[in-house]
A protein has these predicted regions:
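N-terminal secretory signal peptides
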Residues: 1-22, 35-41
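Conserved C-terminal helix/tail region of periplasmic/extracytoplasmic solute-binding proteins
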Residues: 13, 368-399
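N-terminal twin-arginine translocation
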Residues: 20-29, 37-54
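Early extracytoplasmic/lumenal segment of secretory-pathway proteins
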Residues: 54-125
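A structural signal for short loop-to-beta-strand junctions that line the ligand-binding cleft
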Residues: 114-123, 138-178, 204
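Ligand-binding pocket segment of bilobal, Venus flytrap-like solute-binding proteins
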Residues: 127-129, 206-210, 214, 218, ...
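A bilobed periplasmic-binding-protein/Venus flytrap-type ligand-binding module shared by bacterial periplasmic
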Residues: 178-185, 220-223, 301-316, 334-338
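Mature extracytoplasmic/periplasmic domains
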Residues: 308-373
Length: 399
């Protein structure tokens, strides 16, 4: 049987998660919540001590809206094909809401080198740096991943300062952060930070609980390069803008990956978003939302595969087989056509001509040189800065 975390609390959480896998749209829209809760409790109460799937499986923890999905069939097509051809199966769970809350769930297991409940996870690289520096991740064997070695974009090999050569992290997607607005309410769109302060939006604006995305976008809107040489003064100015907007009631929502629910229901009319999520919402619901990477600059990050120390050697090799599968350009193109984020796989743009010709020149997936000029990375923080800035951010958000 598959292993569960040694920590009893984490083990119970994992058992409940695996016992109640819902359609992703239900999760994001908050549908059937009552039934889900009842089902979760019922299944958890009768779960066996070992729980989970069989021994011939691995568990991949990811974000929502982050893998191609067939609504009618209720499957992830690329993953379904992989499971059919591999001699093991991948249990795919959309458990990452934001980096800090997910890290809090697995922190104890990581520190003890115990199984976390996941054989591979795809957190953001700034968080992966924390795990790398703590010695909590296993080094990849590129002999098992020829596609990665051949097809990872050249710029990505050295993109993470704490992991030159990508020994411990392999990019999954490069998410971009911008903002969105209800097109019916604001047909002219929103293009500056001041636009978000429109009195018509009072109580209807939301921001993301990821500090680097929210503060990065504010810094950029205030004329500061988030990747540049800024410090406490610039951070404090950005925080002052955010605190004023929250205290006045203009911003009324701070969420992680479940923020899309409030956009879909109309509870929120505008806010900071992960670009691809809104592209998918418009695909599902009709073009109800305008979305843009602001002219002054939006944010870009990297979510990367990692393998925690508690994963067995056998399952680490299986994870490497899975990653290598997704580094085939045609598979990467199929995923990118759905998630609408920048793909790190060379050749995916050429492969997209066969997968979905309408997406070949989609700048959300394949940014041009001009597009890259409008994307900003958040600079690497020292541990002391990270702690101090994160504490200040959490305080203002009331988290």
């Amino acid at each position: 049987m598959a292993r569960l975390p040694e920590d009893p609390m984490v083990r119970n959480i994992v058992q409940m998660i695996r016992g109640a896998q819902l359609n992703r749209r239900q999760l994001l829209r908050g549908a059937a919540v009552g039934a889900a809760a009842a089902g979760t409790l019922g299944l958890a109460s009768c779960a066996g001590g070992s729980g989970g799937g069989g021994g011939d499986s691995i568990i991949w923890g990811n974000w929502t809206y982050y893998l191609d999905f067939d609504e009618e069939e209720g499957i992830n097509p690329t993953l379904e094909r992989f499971n059919e051809m591999a001699d093991f199966t991948v249990q795919y769970v959309e458990d990452i809401d934001d980096n800090n809350t997910f890290y809090g769930k697995i922190k104890d297991a990581l520190e003890l080198d115990q199984f976390t409940g996941y054989d591979t996870i795809t957190m953001t690289d700034w968080m992966n740096t924390r795990l790398i520096e703590a010695g909590q991740l296993q080094e990849f064997d590129y002999a098992n991943m020829p596609n990665v070695e051949n097809n990872l974009l050249e710029s990505e090999w050295e993109a993470l300062g704490s992991d030159p050569g990508r020994k411990f992290s392999i990019p999954w997607q490069l998410p971009t952060t911008g903002w969105a607005w209800n097109s019916e309410a604001f047909p002219e769109g929103l293009h500056t930070l001041d636009d978000l302060m429109n009195p018509k939006l009072k109580g209807k604006v939301q921001v993301l609980s990821e500090m680097r995305d929210t503060i990065g976008l504010i810094l950029s809107g205030q004329g500061v390069d988030p990747a540049g040489d800024w410090g406490d003064a610039e951070f404090d100015t950005a925080m002052e803008w955010l605190e004023t907007a929250i205290d006045s009631g203009q911003i009324n929502n701070v969420k992680g990956n479940d923020y899309t629910q409030d956009l879909e229901t109309g509870t929120m009319l505008a806010g900071f978003v992960w670009y691809g999520d809104v592209v998918m919402m418009n695909t599902d619901l009709g073009d109800q939302w305008g979305v843009e990477i602001p002219e002054f600059g939006g944010m870009i990050a990297r979510d990367s595969f990692t393998v925690p120390n508690g994963t067995t050697a056998e399952n680490k090799a299986r994870v490497e087989e899975l990653i290598d599968y997704y580094y085939q350009p045609e598979i990467a193109a199929e995923v990118a056509a759905y998630v609408a984020y920048v793909t790190p796989v060379q050749g995916a743009q050429e492969a997209m001509a066969q997968v979905d010709p309408s997406q070949v020149d989609n700048p959300a997936i394949f940014p041009t040189e001009t597009d890259w000029e409008h994307l900003r990375q958040f600079r690497t923080l020292t541990p002391e800065e990270d702690n101090r800035y994160s504490t200040a951010f959490q305080r203002v958000l009331g988290l």
